């Protein structure tokens, strides 16, 4: 008779090792069937395509969870330094295909769905984008998570689980109309709620100073409920966690006010607390000082820091003493990266916890805080910098205001000692801005409270040092770094452009997918006839596929032999979609003037969302659609010029349009685009760039050779010189007849016959207060576009430049970016250790 099992032996049977993985197609089919019937409770007679998508998602998720659990066990045992990436935005897009790619499951799932009479691509299209971001900043966070997992870093993304992400954009009569993005309506198969880790977050209240320390009393409490999403690395069995917080009212919310006789009212008012995580603020590069937004910023910070400290205290080697109350080793075990100033409250909040709660003395606490935090700056536009009214802090976060005052006082004392009598320097460097309304400058707080400050492209990091934080750079030059942005080659090549990935793998193997610098090997193939043919063929296939999609979605017929000229990004004056518009009009006028001439046919695609309150951006969209209405219906033009506004541009649409693009427009005024990452995606996918010397364009030109991009326009120095001299738009308007004609057409109502005054604000801005100097670059831009046309006529030479660009895009992998953060800011080394898969023993 078998000896009875001990409790511990019985418990050992509860193990991920006991669960079969998805080895083959038959397994996938079996698991799919099981989920359709047992998870979704449907049979084939009533199942909808959405049910089939969910069944497949659960099937793929099953393959993740064993690795996810294993990864977390592995971190607990090894106790590495943990990286916490704090961001108010994570623009993840869809998850299914990315998970299949990173786990190497795509072939098995493709075959299994085919055998079940389903089309994998159709199922993938059912998934909602997780649109928890506005644009570049949120998408960067998503790429970074992918790279951190692929590099085996013990990293966590922390943010907010917005119930409504970035709005869906509809175009109605040429105008943008916003619709709520109810992305969770059908449920989210990738997230796991973790109510056992729910944490309280405090607001309002008052501060009391006692002999035993400082108390923050009479606060309103909101609960933060974590939802975890797995983040798989590429084929390394590492699965990290993105933890997003959702706001919940406590059960006694408003009921503890004994004077509230209305129980129903009190329960209904729970919504007020839960509104904190209701919706993403749709502003890109613009600060709108709303109290709800400040609440969101503190909410994510307060919940996350409690979580970080809980994990630090319970980690195996978190501290030397048994009760783990010593925070000496905190910066050796924890790195906090602030994605812009939005999570800046991490600095005073960590101070509050250390000083008020953990009773660490101020100077020690400040040293710990500085060593732990690092800050990434993402913009130089003054209207984007966060400057919160002191009065709002006083009410919402009274203790944090005191702490910020104390931080500022010590900081200013230090500056005054180094620069005696320089009162203006003190004013410039203060965290508190005096004036009609006292404000807190969050960027200054971040610089003071961090051990590293970085810009996101070399030119931007120079501007940060020479201009934005000049005084701070003089104080602590060693603190400032550059970390040029990057993109994940898994999503932005392998997933979105399998045709291109395949012909590259055939030539140089697949090592480039985790070491993108290997693309350099393609340089030897620049003159290889077969490779030139293959690259051109893949591009043509992508264009045909995208054309078919456009026809299906928007009912527009386009010429797939035309040059696909693509300008997709948030709509903003500094990104200069208006410069593109002027080129389109100029091209149109040239065709009309000389219709017999042979023009290179173009399809110009412009896409992007405008912040709902940004009047000029909305006018720009209306102008693009109005130009399209005229150009696309002019029989003289035919299919030589088409203008398409790509509605509801988002991650999943980017994955379709970028592989089909011939020309990538990156035309911001020099010195305004911190880096840009769309530029990198186009480069990697075989489009050529027309752009200014701004952001990462500068480094792209350096990597590929300036002669392999179409660079035009003012450099940063020229823009500064023009500012000194005084920019006079009228000068250019008078001197350039084609520009004058285009502007006059806009202002006379040529593109808005039913409302001739429609664009008067746009013309008035361009003529009298254009901060971004559109006219100053018009002439150079038009000439540069003519060069584009000339090269495009010679398909072979064009494709050779494409190959050179792809071969030189290796620097722009987020793996390279994250490796630099790891070594130079966080003090950790990437690891190529393969965690054993769940069906094998740990060692």
Curated annotation (Swiss-Prot):
PTM statement from Swiss-Prot or TrEMBL: Phosphorylation of Ser-15 converts phosphorylase B (unphosphorylated) to phosphorylase A.
Keyword Cell membrane on entry: no
Binding positions (AMP): 43, 197, 310
List of residues that carry Phosphoserine: 15, 524
GO terms classed as biological process: glycogen catabolic process
Site feature: May be involved in allosteric control: 156
Needed co-factor(s): pyridoxal 5'-phosphate
Regulation: Activity of phosphorylase is controlled both by allosteric means (through the non-covalent binding of metabolites) and by covalent modification. Thus AMP allosterically activates, whereas ATP, ADP, and glucose-6-phosphate allosterically inhibit, phosphorylase B.
Enzyme Commission number(s): 2.4.1.1
GO molecular function, one term: pyridoxal phosphate binding
Site location (Involved in the association of subunits): 109, 143
rRNA-binding recorded as keyword: no
Modified residues (N-acetylalanine): 2
Transmembrane regions: none
Subunit structure: Homodimer. Dimers associate into a tetramer to form the enzymatically active phosphorylase A.
Family according to the record: Belongs to the glycogen phosphorylase family.
Function, in words: Glycogen phosphorylase that regulates glycogen mobilization. Phosphorylase is an important allosteric enzyme in carbohydrate metabolism. Enzymes from different sources differ in their regulatory mechanisms and in their natural substrates. However, all known phosphorylases share catalytic and structural properties.
Protein name as it appears in the record: Glycogen phosphorylase, brain form
Annotated gene: Pygb
């Amino acid at each position: 008779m078998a000896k009875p099992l001990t409790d511990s032996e019985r418990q050992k049977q509860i193990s991920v090792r006991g669960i079969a993985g998805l080895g083959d197609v038959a397994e996938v089919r079996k698991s799919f069937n099981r989920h359709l019937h047992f998870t979704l409770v449907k049979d084939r007679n009533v199942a909808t395509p959405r049910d089939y998508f969910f069944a497949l998602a659960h099937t793929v998720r099953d393959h993740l969870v064993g690795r996810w659990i294993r990864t977390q066990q592995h971190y607990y045992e090894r106790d590495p330094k943990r990286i916490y990436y704090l961001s108010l935005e994570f623009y993840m897009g869809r998850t299914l295909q990315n998970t299949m790619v990173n786990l190497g499951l795509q072939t098995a799932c493709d075959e299994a769905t085919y055998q079940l009479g389903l089309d994998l691509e159709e199922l993938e299209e059912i998934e909602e984008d997780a649109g928890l971001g506005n644009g570049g900043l949120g998408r960067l966070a998503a790429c970074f998570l992918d790279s951190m997992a692929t590099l085996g870093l013990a990293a966590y993304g922390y943010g907010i689980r917005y119930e409504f992400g970035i709005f869906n954009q509809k175009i109605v009569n040429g105008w943008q109309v916003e619709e709520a993005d109810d992305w969770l309506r059908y449920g989210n198969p990738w997230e796991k709620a973790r109510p056992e880790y729910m944490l309280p977050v405090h607001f309002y209240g008052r501060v009391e100073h006692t002999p035993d320390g400082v108390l923050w009393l009479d606060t309103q409490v909101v609960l933060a409920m974590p939802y975890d999403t797995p983040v798989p690395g590429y084929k390394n069995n590492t699965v990290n966690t993105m933890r997003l917080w959702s706001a919940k009212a406590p059960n006694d919310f408003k009921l503890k006010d004994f004077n509230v006789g209305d129980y129903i009212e009190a329960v209904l008012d729970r919504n007020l607390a839960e509104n904190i995580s209701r919706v993403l603020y749709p502003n890109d590069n613009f600060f709108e000082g709303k109290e709800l937004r400040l609440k969101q910023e503190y909410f994510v910070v307060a919940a996350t820091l409690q979580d970080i400290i809980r994990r630090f205290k319970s980690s195996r080697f978190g501290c030397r003493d048994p009760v783990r109350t010593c925070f000496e080793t905190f910066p050796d075990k924890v790195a906090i990266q602030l994605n812009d100033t939005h999570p800046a409250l991490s600095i005073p909040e960590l101070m509050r916890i250390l000083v008020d709660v953990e009773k660490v003395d101020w100077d020690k606490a400040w040293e710990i805080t500085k060593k732990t935090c690092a800050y990434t700056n993402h913009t130089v536009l003054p209207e984007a910098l966060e400057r919160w009214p002191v009065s709002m802090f006083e009410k919402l976060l009274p203790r944090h205001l005191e702490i910020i005052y104390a931080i500022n006082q010590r900081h200013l004392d230090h500056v005054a000692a180094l620069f005696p009598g320089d009162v203006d320097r003190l004013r410039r460097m203060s965290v508190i801005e005096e004036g009609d309304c006292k404000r807190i400058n969050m960027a200054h707080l971040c610089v003071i409270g961090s051990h590293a400050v970085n810009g996101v492209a070399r030119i931007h990091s120079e501007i940060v040092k020479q201009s934005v934080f000049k005084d701070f750079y003089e104080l602590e030059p060693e603190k400032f770094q550059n970390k040029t942005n990057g993109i994940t080659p898994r999503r932005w090549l392998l997933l979105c452009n399998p045709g291109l990935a395949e012909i590259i793998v055939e030539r140089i193997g697949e090592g480039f997918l985790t070491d993108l610098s290997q693309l350099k090997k393609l340089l030897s193939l620049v003159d290889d006839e077969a490779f030139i043919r293959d690259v051109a063929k893949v591009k043509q296939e992508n264009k045909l596929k995208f054309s078919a999609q456009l026809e299906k979605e928007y009912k527009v017929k386009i010429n797939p032999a035309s040059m696909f000229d693509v300008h997709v990004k948030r709509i903003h004056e500094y990104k200069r979609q208006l410069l593109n518009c002027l080129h389109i009009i100029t091209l149109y006028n040239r065709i009309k003037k000389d219709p017999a001439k042979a023009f290179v046919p173009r399809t110009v695609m412009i896409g992007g969302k405008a912040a709902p309150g940004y009047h000029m951006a909305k006018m720009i969209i209306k102008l693009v659609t109005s130009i399209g209405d005229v150009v696309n219906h002019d029989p003289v033009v035919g299919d030589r010029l088409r203008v398409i506004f790509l509605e509801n541009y988002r991650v999943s649409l980017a994955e379709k349009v970028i592989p089909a693009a011939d020309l990538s427009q990156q035309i911001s005024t020099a010195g305004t685009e911190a880096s840009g990452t769309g530029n990198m995606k186009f480069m990697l996918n075989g489009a050529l760039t027309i752009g200014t010397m701004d952001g990462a364009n500068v480094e792209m030109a350096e990597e590929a050779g300036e002669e392999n991009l179409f660079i035009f326009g003012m450099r940063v120095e020229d823009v500064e010189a023009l500012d000194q001299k005084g920019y006079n738009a009228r000068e250019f308007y008078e001197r350039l007849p084609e520009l004058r004609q285009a502007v006059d057409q806009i202002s006379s109502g040529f593109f808005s016959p039913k409302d001739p005054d429609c664009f008067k604000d746009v013309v008035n801005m361009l003529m009298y207060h254009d901060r971004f100097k559109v006219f100053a670059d018009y002439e150079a831009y038009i000439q540069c576009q003519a060069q584009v046309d000339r090269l495009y006529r010679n398909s072979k030479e064009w494709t050779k430049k494409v190959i050179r660009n792809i071969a030189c895009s290796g620097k722009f992998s987020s793996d390279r970016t994250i490796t630099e953060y790891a070594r130079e800011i966080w003090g950790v080394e990437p690891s190529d250790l393969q965690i054993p898969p769940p069906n094998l023993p740990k060692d």
